[in-house]
Amino acid sequence: MKSKLIYGSKAQKVFEIAKERKFALPAINVSGTNSINAVLETASDLNSPVIIQFSHGGAQFIAGKSIDNTSHYASISGAISGAHHIHNVSDNYKAEVIIHTDHCSRKNLPWIDGLLEYGNNFYKRKGYPLFSSHMIDLSDEPIEDNINTCKEYLKKLTDLEMTLEIELGITGGEEDGVDNTGIDSKKLYTQPEEVSYAYSELISISENFIIAAAFGNVHGVYRPGNVSLTPKILKNSQEYVSKKFQIPDNSINFVFHGGSGSSLDDIREAIDYGVIKMNIDTDLQYAFTEGVRDYIIDKKEYLLSQIGNPEGKDIPNKKYYDPRIWLREGENTFKNRLKKAFEDLNNINTLD
């Protein structure tokens, strides 16, 4: 699996190539093997690198909703299980993949601690990490507290050849049980000074970090005009940091959160300013559901009973209600929407 996993210096190299060639990697939240396999299949078909990520809630779902998650055990074991699945099946696909965990607030840090404990043992046995990266999201705290904690985790991740994602400014909307719909709009826009502070503190430890800087991003999907994205904030931050630290233009690796429903112009402009990763969840949830919905509507008369359909009262319907059939329909519509995301991100045949 090691050759298929993008991690450490290889991840940094991929990010640099992405900025040079003006493309970004889609980061897909998954909640089971159906979505994992659909991501791997799409990335393989398109010959393009991809990021598969687990949220705290998505990981819990993989382990099983009946498992007590008070101590984060379900989220820990679910994320580990999902990551192992990627390692185990990826040789069947051409895709190269970054395995990541999504937003982790302070109250959920024991989740990451549990993954790191397991990950340390995995790294000692294998010589490479189980996960490529983790995200720590303390954007609702004072920046000093945010970065001080992130520095401690960056040290731990660096020892495992992993990357840290941090967040500056808050992504609006609601996702995975976190509701920021009523947040002060000023917090939706990161300032260059904040990016500069984070960069100066983290670069002293390692270059293996990426920054989710807020530029009006909102989780979920909204009608056009209801969300005001300002990608120029990223440009201003790049220029500020470049001048202050005398480093090349676009040195910061930025992350675009809340990618669902975003316009192509905003996406491409953000890529111009150093975005190398864009999170997509809501659109793909709906896309998967579309396939299942349409199949059930189309085959309704074959799904009303186990035996008996328009072709005859004694004809069995097993081939219609077998979950593998309608789950595959969901995978196919999921893949179609994901392909569009790859196209929007200018990430087609980028492994050549």
Describe the role of every protein-language-model region.
Residues M1-P26:
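N-terminal amphipathic alpha-helix/helix-capping segment at the start of soluble metabolic enzymes
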Residues S9-I17, T33-K94, S105-N250, L264-E269, ...:
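Alpha/beta enzyme core
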Residues A27-N29, I51-Q53, I98-H100:
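Short, conserved beta-strand segments within well-ordered enzyme catalytic domains
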Residues N29, H72, S185-L188, V227, ...:
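Hydrophobic alpha-helical scaffolding
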Residues V30, I99, H103-S105, I252-S262:
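Glycine-rich beta-to-alpha transition loops that act as phosphate-gripper elements at the mouths
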Residues I67-T70, I99-T101, E290:
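Glycine-rich nucleotide/cofactor/substrate-binding loop typically near the N-terminus or early
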Residues D91, R223, I233, S242-Y321:
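Catalytic-face loop-and-helix region of soluble metabolic enzyme cores
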Residues D298-D352:
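Extended, intrinsically disordered, low-complexity segments
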